[in-house]
Every structure is written in C-alpha cells, then in structure tokens.
Amino acid sequence: MFRRALRLGLGPGLPYRGLRTRKGGFTLDWDAKVSDFKKKVDSILPGKKYEVLYDTSHLPPEQADVVIIGGGILGLSVAFWLKKLESRRGAIRVLVVEQDHTYSRASSTGPSVGGIWQQFSVPENVQLSLFSINFLRNINEYLAVVDAPPVELQFNPSGCLLLASEKDAATLENNVKMQRQEGAKVCLMSPEQLQTKFPWINVEGVALASYGLEDEGWFDAWSLLQGLRRKVQSMGVFFCQGEVTRFITSSTPMKTPTGEHVVLRRINNVHVKMDKSLEYQPVECAVVINAAGAWSGKIAELAGVGKGLPGTLQGTKLPVEPRKRYVHLWHCPQGPGLETPLVADISGVYFRREGLGSNYLGGCSPTEEEEPDPTNLNVDHDFFQNKVWPHLVQRVPSFKTLEVQSAWAGYYDYNTFDQNGVVGPHPLVVNMYFATGFSGRGLQHAPGIGRAVAEIMLEGHFKTIDMSPFLFTRFYLGEKLQEYNIL
C-alpha cells in the first residue's frame, strides 16, 4: 500500500483543480491607486517629475499561482503547456524566475548539439522523442505570435547512427525491436551494409549498427528557446531575473501505513533575490516547479528535500548535480561531407555535420574518474586531443587532418542515480513538482516533459505519456530506470 501511495504522491494537494492564492484583485487595485497618486503628485509639484514612491517595476509580482524556477527550455515548456491547457485565458498566473538571462549556464542548450533521436533503451524516452518531433515539425502552429516572424528551427533530418560492438549487439537489437513497437522508424545494419551506405566509416570493431530512417537529426536549440520565451510572454507569463534563496513552508506531521513518521510540507512563499542587488521579493504561490537544471538539487534542499535520516523518504535527496561537458567544433575539408548523420561511436565519442562548410561538432562524456571541475566553464583542450581525436580518427580516417576551430563548455543536469529525468510531484513537499535531471536530453524531450508536468499538476495524472516511472519516489524505492543511450 505504501509503495502505491508513494508512486502516486503522498499528502493533500493533488490534483490542483483550481489554483488560487488569496482572493481578490489586491495587486491590480493597488497598482491603480499608486498610478493615480503619482499623477496627482506630478500635477501639484512644479519642475521635474518627482518620484515619491520607489520604483518596483523590476520586482516579480507578490502573488502567483505557479512559480517556475528555471527559465530554460524545460521551464519554458512547462509554462507554455500550463497556459495552453488552462481552462480560460488568464486562469493561471505563472511566474518564471531565471537567474541567467544570457543562458550561458543553461543545462539544455549550453553543451547540446541540438540532436533528436528515438533510439533509446527506455520506452518512455522513445515516446517523448516522437511527441517532440511532432511538436517541432508543427512548431509555428504552437509558437506563432501575431505580427512576429515565424520560428525557424533549421531542422536537419540527417538521422542518427548508433554503433555497437559484439558485446552490445544483442542489446542494440532488442532496443530497436522496442523502438519499432513504439512507432519509431529505425533499421539495423550489418558492417557490410554500414560500409556501403557510409563508405567513409571504418567498420573495425563494429558488429551491428542502428540508423533512424526519419524524424531524427538536429535543430537550432537557441531558436526553440527564444520561440518558447516569446510565445509564453504573449500568453501572459511573468518573467523575473533573480535567484531563489528561500522558501517559507508550513508543515504537518503524519505517519505512513508502514509506521514511518514523516512531515508533509507545503511551500507558501518563494523568496527571490534580485540580480546584482541585496533586494528580495517574497512571492506567495500555490505551486512551485523545480526546473532549475543542474542546480535543481540545491533548490530541492532549500525546500527540505533530503533533510532527514539516510534511508528514509524524508532523507532521500534529489540526485541531480552539475556535470561539465565540452563541445568542440572542427574543420575538415576531407571529412565525410553532406551525408553525415549524428554518429554515436562505440567509444562514446559522437559527432555530426555543422552547416555546409566542412565543419563538424562533437565530443565525448568523460569517465567518472575524469569528471572535470564543475565550478567553472573553462575548456580543457587536452581532453579533445587525448580522449576524442584518437577515436574520431579510428572511426573516420579522414578526420586525421581536422583542425579544431573552437570549443565551449556547458552543464548537464546529471542524475547520478540512473541518468533519467525526474518528472512530477515530490511525495512530501506536496506542491513542489520536478522537471529536471535528464542528463543532456532535456532539450529534445522538453515539449513532452512540459506537457506531462502540466497534466499531472492540473489533472492529477499523466495523460499523453505515462511518466510514472520518472517520479521522485523511485529514488527511495531503489527502482532504477537506466537509460544506456546517452551522448
């Protein structure tokens, strides 16, 4: 019984069928009174305009139904679907809090090469990709704004190619069978077939390959982010540049069916510290969405998540932390050319074509022992030389003459438990929901994740895609949802 209750989420607050803060239109009335007062002062006092009251236009609203922490792809997607699914226009007051409006530290766009593919080992990830590709192909049906230019994602449907050794061939074959059952168009290729289709590949060590026949490739992540931001602003979403530093909560002690004593918490206020200032604004709210990417673990701690005895539900942490990843851009006129898909090698190295000028993007995730310092975004150029380039040359001999043009670093919102995302409510902090921990896949899965969070928040259950395996409670229950196809 307890396991079933855990999976569904403990405590009151689900579903939120009518999101409310305090009754009345206090904020609107107050703003109108302040405006009238300023006009009277200006008409009485001579000379230059006199500002009697302190300007608070840079502050977030004092009340919101939903506060979304994190204004990246995932946070914006949640905001979009909340407004898209609201019962009437303006029914849900949404505030997005983002600390870095340049998105230089964003988990979904910084280290991403913009890839989208259906070749995963977890069925729900395949379903998310299929949902996303439909969203992206019809992007302007979703994100069009009156009198604004259309969103141009520059989608390149060149496919994704996964290579497997003899050891992993059976797993790859089973994955492809599952992917086809979910509706993905994926084929298996022998080394001979691989060599025929892509003659520039050295097939040494390759026992089997899988290739996406349609709806796979890459797109411009920045265009999607800006398109979502523009759209949700047009839908009435509020934005604030600041940092969440504190939650004001209320608590209720209770006992679980197994006899464990727990404390249910509810977030009543979010404290937002203004950018480059000592100022802060408390925001009264009904729901908090934790979409803070690589820093979502710290946000969860502020709400008391994991602040209990180890091995208990109260002491179960959100296992998401920042992991630094590099992306390298190189030029190689003798390279594979225009027919290059997104390639994932046996070694873990990946690459794709970038534009039409013989440029390529790629990289590789380090081993646990080689994890770089995440406190800065400095690029270790020796990593490419020692860990990436040798594998590139082994698989594509023409890359021997490549010249690195540039490189940058970004953060993965890395889930150390099973490298899969966390979606839905926390069982004890009953009005905190998660959209984080996708370990580099947040960009391509954002449309489906955003809808899933909006559905469970508004309806009390997942509808479009059943994301129950992604609930927070799996960390306490020890039920890993291991995804193996991670770039």
Swiss-Prot record:
Question: Gene Ontology terms, cellular component aspect?
Answer: mitochondrial inner membrane; mitochondrion
Entry's InterPro entries? FAD-dep_OxRdtase (IPR006076), FAD/NAD-bd_sf (IPR036188)
> EC annotation?
1.-.-.-
> How does the record say this protein sits in the membrane?
Single-pass membrane protein
Q: Its Gene Ontology molecular function terms?
A: oxidoreductase activity
**UniProt-annotated location(s):** Mitochondrion inner membrane
Keyword Membrane in record: yes
Asked if the Swiss-Prot or TrEMBL record annotates the protein with the keyword Mitochondrion, the reply is: yes
User: What are the required cofactors?
Assistant: FAD
Q: Which UniProt keywords apply?
A: Electron transport, FAD, Flavoprotein, Membrane, Mitochondrion, Mitochondrion inner membrane, Oxidoreductase, Respiratory chain, Transmembrane, Transmembrane helix, Transport
User: Where is this protein chiefly located?
Assistant: mitochondrion
One Pfam annotation reads DAO
Domain of life where this protein originates: Eukaryota
Q: Where are the transmembrane segments?
A: 62-82
GO annotation terms (biological process): mitochondrial respiratory chain complex I assembly
Its assembly, as annotated, is: Associates with components of the mitochondrial respiratory chain complex I.
Physiological role: Required for the assembly of the mitochondrial membrane respiratory chain NADH dehydrogenase (Complex I). Involved in mid-late stages of complex I assembly.
Q: What is this protein called?
A: FAD-dependent oxidoreductase domain-containing protein 1
Give me the gene this protein comes from. Answer: Foxred1
